[in-house]
């Protein structure tokens, strides 16, 4: 008869790293070309003037300027960058 307990196994103990999504530059902030404005999954916010969209839906500035959040119709949001 065993005089030590067998060690049990657990089905827990895993967790994924946070994705660090969200707005990185807010309205009125000055950005340089290439700065990331929003990291997102899907097009929660659409690219407007002078804003590009990466393959993972990241929005980034294509020119130096000031970030502006706008509406595109009733429900769509967009972000644009205008020269300072």
Curated annotation (Swiss-Prot):
Molecular function per GO: structural constituent of ribosome
Keywords: Ribonucleoprotein, Ribosomal protein
Annotated spans, Disordered: 1-23
Keyword Nucleotide-binding: no
InterPro entries the UniProt entry points to: Ribosomal_bL27 (IPR001684), Ribosomal_bL27_CS (IPR018261)
Compositionally skewed regions (Polar residues) per UniProt: 7-19
Family matches, as PROSITE patterns: RIBOSOMAL_L27
NCBIfam families recorded: L27
The name this protein goes by in its record: Large ribosomal subunit protein bL27
The organism of origin for this protein: Acaryochloris marina (strain MBIC 11017)
């Amino acid at each position: 008869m065993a005089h030590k307990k067998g060690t049990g196994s657990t089905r827990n103990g895993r967790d994924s790293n946070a994705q660090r999504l969200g707005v990185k530059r807010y309205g009125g902030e000055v950005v340089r070309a290439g700065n990331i404005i929003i990291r997102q999954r899907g097009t929660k916010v659409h690219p407007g003037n002078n804003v590009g969209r990466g393959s993972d839906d990241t929005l980034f500035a294509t020119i130096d300027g000031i970030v502006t959040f706008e509406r595109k119709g009733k429900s769509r949001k967009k972000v644009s960058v205008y020269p300072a």
